[in-house]
Swiss-Prot record:
The EC number(s) this enzyme carries: 2.3.3.13
Entry annotated with the keyword Amino-acid biosynthesis: yes
Enzyme class (EC, first level): transferase
Function recorded in the entry: Catalyzes the condensation of the acetyl group of acetyl-CoA with 3-methyl-2-oxobutanoate (2-oxoisovalerate) to form 3-carboxy-3-hydroxy-4-methylpentanoate (2-isopropylmalate).
Residues that bind a divalent metal cation: D14, H194, H196, N230
Entry keywords, A to Z: Amino-acid biosynthesis, Branched-chain amino acid biosynthesis, Leucine biosynthesis, Metal-binding, Transferase
Annotated pathway: Amino-acid biosynthesis; L-leucine biosynthesis; L-leucine from 3-methyl-2-oxobutanoate: step 1/4
A Pfam family it matches: HMGL-like
Family affiliation: Belongs to the alpha-IPM synthase/homocitrate synthase family.
Molecular function as annotated in GO: 2-isopropylmalate synthase activity; metal ion binding
Protein name per the record: Probable 2-isopropylmalate synthase
């Protein structure tokens, strides 16, 4: 097993082949910058010959002078390789299919012809002075003796790395281990693997390959890619670090940030139960689990959420226990007696039994009712009026009128959209309270269907003292849902300051 593994990210090439995904040049550059900041070794920027826009995107990324090696994909065809070279990449990833099914039905050529084409492609790319990585497409369904012959020949032709693609995800970890070990023994250059997730084993197969000596793994952010996707960058990286103790020069605390960026730009939603970066990756509802996590996080968490840029959440519902609810109340700054806590727990479970998702706002409302503390109507910030103007020919503008500790104040601001303008106006208004509140996270989801859907907005806010809170707002208007969430969050932070 190698001491260090290279991370070859193909989000911008194979990941963009996800059905329905198409990124602009600017979006691809933005993702490339973030990948470089994260620390991947290679960024496969695209397939330069595919289109003019793809060529421009690859060339733009190559011109960013990033620390990562910039790679372009090319068939073993001179025109493809020329396009990659013209895009000024550091590395050309050349490939040709080698399985009999691909040779017969797609390429319509013999094994001998494919071998000759592979050698010519590698030699041509190598003669241009770039790093050359060679892939035998559909390697895992290729005759083993022929596959090894192809790899040996391409290394002799000048390949700096060889890649073993499990193109349709048919391998099991033991089989992937055996194949990778054979390739490692056959060549004297680093071996890479590229695993697809058709049977849900892309990550497991990638790790098995590393155990067998592979020194590089192809991955995509959030595991996006054709069909069922590719090996997930975040899962492979954290497994290598946490389970194998293998050296990686990456900033794991950026994983969630990177995941959210790709989710936003591609429109491919990350399921909440996704390992490492999913919304529920560090969420606990069961009373037994949440009790354990509150006392000692390692009881039910294999890694720390902050190590990947995530946060721990104690979720309220019918499975929630006293310790979890008490901890949540403490975070809200609400002190309760044991008797009051019993009643709050009873009401929370009652809501959960009715199938209701118990939010922080629900818990706060229940607690205020039980404890009899200051009602929300007497909060530090009360929104009296908001007006937002937007259109296709002028900048979105928002004006607000609020009461701050009973005194009326007005503010206005512009923004990149209606929500941004409204939040900026509110931030300007609350400066009168001596508060500087930053919006750290924003999430929108439609609770119901249709154009009049009820929207729920979740915001995470942080004040100048580092206090953090999460608040939600729901309304049929996205701007109003956002404003409600922001005002509720500010009031929670203000209450903590007073306490």
């Amino acid at each position: 097993m190698p001491d260090r593994v290279r991370i070859f990210d193909t989000t911008l090439r194979d990941g963009e082949q996800t059905p329905g995904v198409s990124l602009t040049v600017e979006e691809k550059v933005e993702i490339a910058r973030k990948l470089d900041e994260f620390g991947v070794d290679t960024i496969e920027a695209g397939f330069p010959v595919a289109s003019e826009g793809e060529f421009e995107a690859v060339r733009a990324i190559a011109g960013e002078e990033l620390d990562a090696e910039i790679c372009g994909l090319a068939r073993c065809v001179k025109g493809d390789i020329d396009a990659a070279i013209d895009a000024d990449v550091d590395c050309v990833h050349v490939f040709i299919a080698t399985s009999d099914i691909h040779l017969r039905y797609k390429l319509e050529m013999s094994r001998e012809e494919a071998l000759e084409r592979a050698i010519e492609g590698v030699e041509y790319a190598s003669d241009h002075g770039v790093t050359v990585e060679f892939s035998a497409e559909d390697a895992t369904r290729t005759d083993r003796d022929y596959l090894l012959e192809v790899y040996k020949a391409t290394v002799e032709a000048g390949a700096d790395r060889v890649n073993v693609p499990d193109t349709v995800g048919v391998m099991t970890p033991p089989e992937m281990y055996r194949l990778t070990a054979e390739v490692v023994d056959a060549v004297d250059v680093p071996v890479s693997v590229h695993c697809h997730n058709d049977f849900g084993m892309a990550v497991a197969n990638s790790l098995a390959a590393v155990e067998a000596g592979a020194e590089q793994v192809h991955v995509t952010v959030n595991g996006i890619g054709e069909r069922a996707g590719n090996a997930s960058l975040e899962q492979v990286v954290m497994a290598l670090k946490a389970l194998y103790d293998i050296e990686l020069d990456v900033r794991t605390e950026m994983l969630v940030e990177l995941s959210r960026l790709v989710e936003r730009l591609t429109g491919v939603v990350v399921p909440p139960n996704t390992p490492i970066v999913g919304e529920n990756a560090f969420a606990h509802e069961s009373g037994i689990h949440s009790h354990g996590v509150i006392k000692k996080a390692e009881t039910y968490e294999p890694i720390r959420p902050e190590d990947v840029g995530h946060r721990r959440r104690i979720v309220l519902g019918k499975h929630a226990g006293r310790h979890a609810i008490k901890k949540k109340l403490e975070e809200m700054g609400i002190e309760v007696t044991e008797e009051q806590l019993d009643e709050i727990v009873r009401r929370v479970k009652e809501l959960g039994d009715k199938g209701k998702r118990v939010t922080e706002d629900d818990l706060e409302a229940i607690a205020r009712d039980v404890v009899g503390e200051v009602p929300e109507s007497e909060a530090a910030v009360k929104l009296e009026e908001i007006a937002v103007m937007t259109g296709n020919k002028f900048t979105p503008t928002a004006s607000v009128r609020v009461y701050l500790d009973g005194e009326e104040h007005e503010a206005a601001s512009t923004g990149v959209g209606s929500v941004d303008a409204a939040i900026r106006a509110l931030r300007e208004a609350i400066e009168e309270l001596g508060m500087d509140v930053e919006l750290k996270e924003y999430r929108l989801e439609a609770i119901t269907g249709g154009t009049d859907a009820l929207a729920e907005v979740t915001v995470r806010l942080e004040d100048e003292d580092g206090n953090v809170t999460t608040a939600r707002g729901a309304a049929e208007d996205i701007v109003m849902a956002s404003v409600k969430a922001f005002v509720r969050g500010v009031n929670r932070l203000a209450r903590r300051r007073r306490d």
